[in-house]
Amino acid sequence: MKRTTMATAAALAGGLTLAAPLAAQEVCAVEGDYYDLDAAGVDAFYNCMSDRMVEGYTTEGNEIAAIYRDWTPTATRAAVPGPHGDRFLLTFANDIAAEQYLKFEEGDFEMPVGSVLAKESIAVRDGTGSVGPLFIMTKVDDAPDNDNWLYSAVQPNGKDMKISQSFCSDCHIGFDTQDSMGYPLEEVRLTAN
């Protein structure tokens, strides 16, 4: 639907510093606690990591990895909500999912079959950013044990991640009033137009 563009921020904003290129790739570093980054700092960090996420996810030809950035972003910027290993996360919704997902509804509803959510992830370890998996949820009509969601993921090297459906659904079932979906932090949520 829309190609996302994050605001470009100064490299030193919010305590973020970018080190000199190492091994022909820029190092995306965060000084201090990454939970303390302001919006400009998060944007600068995301912009530093952005191209390498897409390059990694698409290395092995994953179909969703090749197109998810053309979908609707669900937040103004990446954020660290806690799940998925304390990674920065940014979710994109395909055309089928976007209208319903962007309501951030709670209650008795179900996403339409064919909805796909792709969640980018960036880890920070020892002050340095690294690409995490691209987490994918696909709404189907034949997976009642998982609230009709099919869970998958693409590793940073583009290979399919081997995951157990129950590993994902056991956590997502905690969002039972949200059709097993986690939502971005409230302060970064976008809404449907």
Residue ranges with predicted function:
Residues L18-A24:
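Sec/Tat signal peptide C-region and signal peptidase I cleavage site
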Residues T8-L18:
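Hydrophobic helical h-region of N-terminal Sec-dependent signal peptides
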Residues Q25-I163, M181-N193:
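Extracytoplasmic c-type cytochrome modules immediately beyond a signal peptide or single-pass transmembrane anchor
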Residues S164-D176:
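The canonical Cys-X-X-Cys-His
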Residues M1-A9:
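Bacterial N-terminal signal peptides that target proteins for export
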